[in-house]
């Protein structure tokens, strides 16, 4: 057959409603808003084409390869109920399109140029199904939930953290003092804020030293293993690794990375170093809302969460459901399960478009953080369960008596909620009562209860199904 030049509709090649998906295909669910006059089949096919083998015109080199083997296929389209002119387009990608063990390459293909495509008014990647064959090419989290519990020797309850505030402006010595007060009061972890890197008021090496001193002092006093998320994020990968190496030399248990601003390549390198050297890795999702907050354009956070589990991290921030940041309960629980569990069943009610089998890739602890305090503790314990990290920044440091009493209040509240739950009480219904009862035995908790009882951050969530 001679080569036929010219432009032809994408749907002639890339829309294949009869296609049977393979176990090895990467499957994607896109929310597509076509421009007026563009049929949904053409829009879905355009997404499949531009994110795989296609370009805008027929090229003679198409004849040198097997398009049938390598092309992405739009295999199903359904309208979004209640949304005029929006469709969910399902696309299957052959596994050979992707480099093994590279989240970077996977995203460059699937969410690359296609998002600027003229035929589409908007495009959002709602979910990805990672096939077992591809998941097995990733190391994933450096350690995972069980190994972390064993390292820390802490079982049967969520872990407690605190972000040190004010996030910017403290000297290293004062910062270390704040860390020590929180840890000795009963927290498991304290945390560098995401934008604490190495600024003129506090260089990274000084901070690492004073925080390590605080950790060792608090451990000696309490007999518990403590940690501080030392933020290794830096301007270059080499500098980031240098910071991680120094943390390991200090003998601390955990470092931290901003995975979206730092990038997946840097993150995967750091995760591999952490596994080889026994460091836990805490992941902050700074910049995620730029990508995931718009309902009809961007990438849903559940996809960013899956990508992080592949790239590697032991903790990741996952919203609170009850605090000051976005998050709708069922949807949040959907991606919390995707982070922790080995197998997750398809469940459109929770926004999960595909069943996902992680084939024993270690799990990630979800971190609830942002505007939460002791009155939220029963709800958080119920929603997130034991395998989570609950982080109270202002909710610890804002205590009227200072950091250590703030930490005591949180620890008492948590222990009370876990005990009540284990006794069979209903945290959702009796939560306030449980906290009040515990406050009778803890002056620190009752002082915290008095200061925060009226606080609410209640706006309707943007992220609905």
Curated annotation (Swiss-Prot):
Record field: catalytic activity: 2 (2R)-3-phosphoglycerate + 2 H(+) = D-ribulose 1,5-bisphosphate + CO2 + H2O; D-ribulose 1,5-bisphosphate + O2 = 2-phosphoglycolate + (2R)-3-phosphoglycerate + 2 H(+)
N6-carboxylysine found at: 191
GO cellular component, one term: chloroplast
InterPro entries the UniProt entry points to: RuBisCO, RuBisCo_large_chain_AS, RuBisCO_lsu_C, RuBisCO_lsu_C_sf, RuBisCO_lsu_fd_N, RuBisCO_lsu_N_sf, RuBisCO_lsuI
Location of the protein in the cell: Plastid, Chloroplast
NCBIfam families: PRK04208.1 (NF003252)
Main localization of the protein described in the UniProt heading: plastid
Name of the gene: rbcL
Miscellaneous section: The basic functional RuBisCO is composed of a large chain homodimer in a 'head-to-tail' conformation. In form I RuBisCO this homodimer is arranged in a barrel-like tetramer with the small subunits forming a tetrameric 'cap' on each end of the 'barrel'.
Protein name per UniProt: Ribulose bisphosphate carboxylase large chain
Binding site for Mg(2+): 191, 193-194
Ligand binding (substrate): 113, 163, 167, 285, 317, 369
Gene3D superfamilies assigned: Ribulose bisphosphate carboxylase, large subunit, C-terminal domain (3.20.20.110), RuBisCO large subunit, N-terminal domain (3.30.70.150)
């Amino acid at each position: 057959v001679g080569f036929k030049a010219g432009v032809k509709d994408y749907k002639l090649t890339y829309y294949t409603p009869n296609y049977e998906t393979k176990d090895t295909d990467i499957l994607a669910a896109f929310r597509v808003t076509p421009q007026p006059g563009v049929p949904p089949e053409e829009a879905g096919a355009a997404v499949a084409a531009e994110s795989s083998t296609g370009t805008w015109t027929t090229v003679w080199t198409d004849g040198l390869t097997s398009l049938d083997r390598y092309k992405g296929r739009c295999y199903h389209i359904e309208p979004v109920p209640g949304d005029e002119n929006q469709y969910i387009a399902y696309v299957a990608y052959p596994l050979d399109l992707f480099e093994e063990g590279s989240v970077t390459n996977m995203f460059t293909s699937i969410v690359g140029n296609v998002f600027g495509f003229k035929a589409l008014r908007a495009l959002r990647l709602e979910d990805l199904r990672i096939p077992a064959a591809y998941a097995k090419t990733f190391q994933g989290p450096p350690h995972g939930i069980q190994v972390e519990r064993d390292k820390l020797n802490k079982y049967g309850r969520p872990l407690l953290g605190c972000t040190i505030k004010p996030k910017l402006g403290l000297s290293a010595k004062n910062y270390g003092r704040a860390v020590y007060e929180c840890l000795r009061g009963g927290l498991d972890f304290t945390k560098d804020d995401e934008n604490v890197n190495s600024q003129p008021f506090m260089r990274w090496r000084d901070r690492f030293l004073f925080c390590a001193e605080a950790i060792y002092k608090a451990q000696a006093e309490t007999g518990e293993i403590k940690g501080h998320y030392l933020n290794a994020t830096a301007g270059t990968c080499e500098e980031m690794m240098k910071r991680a190496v120094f943390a390991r030399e200090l003998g601390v248990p955990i470092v931290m990375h901003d995975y979206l601003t730092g990038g997946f390549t840097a993150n995967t390198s750091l995760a591999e170093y952490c596994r080889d050297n026994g460091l836990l890795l805490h992941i902050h999702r700074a910049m995620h809302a730029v990508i995931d907050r718009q309902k009809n354009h961007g990438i849903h956070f559940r996809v960013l969460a899956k990508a992080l589990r592949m790239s590697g991290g032991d903790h990741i921030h996952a919203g609170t459901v009850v605090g000051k940041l976005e998050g709708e309960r069922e949807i949040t629980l959907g991606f919390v399960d995707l982070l922790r569990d080995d197998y997750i069943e398809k469940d459109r009610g929770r926004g999960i478009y595909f069943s996902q089998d992680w084939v024993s890739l270690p799990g990630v602890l979800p971190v609830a953080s942002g505007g939460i305090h002791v009155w939220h503790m029963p709800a958080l314990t119920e929603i997130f369960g034991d395998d989570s990290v609950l982080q109270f920044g202002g909710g610890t440091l804002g205590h009227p008596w200072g950091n250590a009493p703030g930490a005591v209040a949180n620890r008492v509240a948590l222990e009370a909620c876990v005990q009540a739950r284990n006794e069979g009480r209903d945290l959702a219904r009796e939560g306030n009562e449980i906290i009040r009862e515990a406050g009778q035995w803890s002056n620190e908790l009752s002082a915290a209860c008095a200061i925060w009882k009226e606080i609410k951050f209640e706006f309707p969530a943007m992220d609905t199904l």
